[in-house]
């Protein structure tokens, strides 16, 4: 799938030498720029396109865009892969409820997502595949796990109206992975609760374990399906979709797997277990990094609650996308925080401050500002401290310190390259 256009990343003096990121599984800051290794790779889980991009989505993709930019500044070759789950239960349910063909709904929302990402200055993935495009890979992976005894069939009862008979859903057996649970560290009770709350089916008759994830869902009446040969007609499960797409774009292992903190379990736990089952116990990500969830009107922003703030709507109202990005960057990517009008107003004011300072004929020498930005970003992508460094430079500039006539240009390029803020 072709992504949105890549924004230009300008060259700036100096370079990062270290980029440490918090690893969820260990609870430690982990170095992601390895000595003698000129490449860093990242898989970030994509959207299910049944609604427009909200601020929570934007915050996650901006967080990992910071990591991408930090790696580039460190001289790394970056390999970035992502997905879009363009066939899944929530999408099909929304299409049915609105009377829109599911493919048209997915296409329209993917287009809007691309427009939002482009406007926000997010660097696109090199490999961007959809669930539909992953079908042949998922069939192969599911067959492999069946043959190795790590997956099993569960008959679909007639009351669920399977299109073909006999029909089987295929599940992965989580107990076949000795390292299952190593990412989240949750108890058995917590796993079942989260699996249930986040769309799982713990009570399905015939499952070996309540939290076994579906790999291949047999086609039901009114739903799309693909010919899986010996697997029967069906469609991919979410977790195996990401596993196969990550392997296609990056290989058996990557530097970072990223997403929102609501993906720690079951999604990242399951997709990592699939990777180990398919490619060996040392397969998967070296670091699992997670962005905090954003609240609105007192509750976590979610499609099910409907308490969403859409990027496209803010843009339609005339808000500069760079002000939106600045409002998001004012909070550390791992923090949970609430979107309010005051948060947006602060982003707008900061954007205006920076524009005013960058339009002057000189400013303080930029060396200390760039060093402070890099020091902040090297320590778990601390964007708020990087913003503070630019604020200090801007206030000094507007106070009349114009010692270096080239400073505004250098700082402008730096906030573009490191923070993704085009001025």
UniProtKB/Swiss-Prot annotation:
A motif ('HIGH' region) lies at residues 47-57. It comes from the Bacteria. Monomer. Catalyzes the ATP-dependent condensation of GlcN-Ins and L-cysteine to form L-Cys-GlcN-Ins. GO terms for molecular function: ATP binding; cysteine-glucosaminylinositol ligase activity; cysteine-tRNA ligase activity; zinc ion binding. A motif ('KMSKS' region) lies at residues 300-304. One of its GO terms (cellular component) is cytosol. PANTHER family: CYSTEINE--TRNA LIGASE, CYTOPLASMIC, CYSTEINYL-TRNA SYNTHETASE. Its cofactor is Zn(2+). Keywords: ATP-binding, Ligase, Metal-binding, Nucleotide-binding, Zinc. The keyword ATP-binding applies. Disulfide bonds: none annotated. Its EC number is 6.3.1.13. Belongs to the class-I aminoacyl-tRNA synthetase family. MshC subfamily. L-cysteinyl-5'-AMP binds at residues 45-48, 60, 83-85, 238, 260-262, 294. This is L-cysteine:1D-myo-inositol 2-amino-2-deoxy-alpha-D-glucopyranoside ligase. The keyword Zinc applies. A motif ('ERGGDP' region) lies at residues 197-202. Zn(2+) binds at residues 45, 242, 267. Gene3D superfamilies: Anticodon-binding domain of a subclass of class I aminoacyl-tRNA synthetases, HUPs. GO terms for biological process: cysteinyl-tRNA aminoacylation; mycothiol biosynthetic process. It catalyses: 1D-myo-inositol 2-amino-2-deoxy-alpha-D-glucopyranoside + L-cysteine + ATP = 1D-myo-inositol 2-(L-cysteinylamino)-2-deoxy-alpha-D-glucopyranoside + AMP + diphosphate + H(+). It comes from Jonesia denitrificans (strain ATCC 14870 / DSM 20603 / BCRC 15368 / CIP 55.134 / JCM 11481 / NBRC 15587 / NCTC 10816 / Prevot 55134) (Listeria denitrificans).
